[in-house]
From Swiss-Prot:
SUPFAM superfamilies noted in UniProt: Colipase-like
Subcellular location: Secreted
Record key words, sorted: Digestion, Disulfide bond, Lipid degradation, Lipid metabolism, Secreted, Signal
Pfam families registered for this protein in UniProt: Colipase (PF01114), Colipase_C (PF02740)
PANTHER family from the UniProt entry: COLIPASE
Name of the gene: CLPS1
Keyword Disulfide bond: yes
Name by which UniProt lists this protein: Colipase A
Signal peptide as annotated in the record: 1-11
Tissues expressing this chain: Expressed by the pancreas.
Disulfide bond entries: 28-39, 34-50, 38-72, 60-80, 74-98
Length: 106
């Protein structure tokens, strides 16, 4: 009976997740896996890890085809001011600065 109870306890899924719902600093393959929705890679040779989104006046990336960013996208409510190009989307080099569009309209 004790073995059955232990087996059930270990079978209950961890809410943190192994493949999705990953915390900052955990290794990822795509931004969809991260709670923050940013899978960040320092260089093409480094492992990608979940990271916080970019804050106001920080460097940011526009949406990328791959779901892995060299610069994280902006936090909710902010806009990444960047000149988007097709080549930049493919090469993951569409970088800009996060700003609050609502504040700049005032």
């Amino acid at each position: 009976l004790l073995l059955v109870a232990l087996a059930v306890a270990y079978a209950v899924p961890d809410p943190r997740g192994v493949i999705i719902n990953l915390e900052a600093g955990e290794i990822c393959l795509n931004s969809a896996q991260c709670k923050s929705e940013c899978c960040h890679q320092e260089s093409s040779l480094s492992l990608a890890r979940c990271a916080a989104k970019a804050s106001e006046n920080s460097e940011c990336s526009a949406w990328t085809l791959y779901g892995v960013y060299y610069k994280c996208p902006c936090e909710r409510g902010l806009t990444c001011q960047v000149d988007k190009t097709l080549v930049g989307s493919i090469m993951n080099t569409n970088f800009g600065i996060c700003f609050d569009a609502a504040r700049s309209e005032e």
